[in-house]
Amino acid sequence: YDRIYGNVYQGIGLGCYSFGESRQIGNPVAFYLFQGARIARICPWLSFNYEWNFGLSGGWKPYDEQYNSYNKMVGSKINAYLNANFYLRWALSPRLSLTSGVTLTHFSNGNTNFPNAGVNTLGGKLGVEYNFYRKEDLTSLHAAASYHIPPFQRHVSYDFVFFGSWRRKGIWMQEGQYPLPESYPVFGFNFAPMYNVDYKLRLGVSLD
């Protein structure tokens, strides 16, 4: 499992943000799903990893012409939250690790309301991890290297996704751009036959 999928992990998380302008945009709180795994093992105690987060964020102060007219970024109280992390993990002991890397974050309402410039951040990541359930020690990694991985049976699988949302648009006039007063629904689907090449790679085409 560790050799095939890079010790993948999933869970739920809670994040709090402050941009130093709480009066204009608020102090958002994000609730999200996350998944991460090892991309490459540099040596027995050092690895390069990724983690993505996807969820919703609240606590925003949407644009109001009278109270926060400088807020040209956020038009909704609830916004989508997307985050990607790339980091190094140093194993200090079988259970304790030090992490350091970069993190990219995007907040947006998907054009469901205006304004929708969104908020994008780039930052550093520094943390300490403690694993309550890890029983292996670092030397067991060498023993795992001799474990035989079963050959992958290549096959075809199918992905089908149906989605729906709503959207608002603006129109250009001589005085400038003005938002339309109403939103409209958007629906769609995609169907993708996928050829499973190995344990971690699938290739295919999609009909949207």
Region locations from a protein language model:
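Residues on the lipid-exposed face of transmembrane beta-strands in outer-membrane beta-barrel proteins
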Residues: 1, 33-39, 52-56, 82-90, ...
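Glycine- and aromatic-enriched membrane insertion/assembly motifs of diderm outer-membrane
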Residues: 1-22, 33, 42, 178-208
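Short glycine/proline- and aromatic-enriched beta-strand/turn motifs that initiate or cap beta-hairpins
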Residues: 1, 139-192
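Outer-membrane beta-barrel "beta-signal"
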Residues: 120-141
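Transmembrane beta-strands of outer-membrane beta-barrel pores
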Residues: 14-20, 54-62, 104-108, 132, ...
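Residues that define the transmembrane beta-barrel architecture of outer-membrane proteins
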Residues: 6, 25-31, 76-82, 118-124, ...
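Repeated loop/turn-to-beta-strand initiation elements of outer-membrane beta-barrel proteins
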Residues: 90-98, 134-138, 199-203
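Transmembrane beta-strands of outer-membrane beta-barrel proteins
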Residues: 8-12, 48-54, 98-102, 124-126, ...
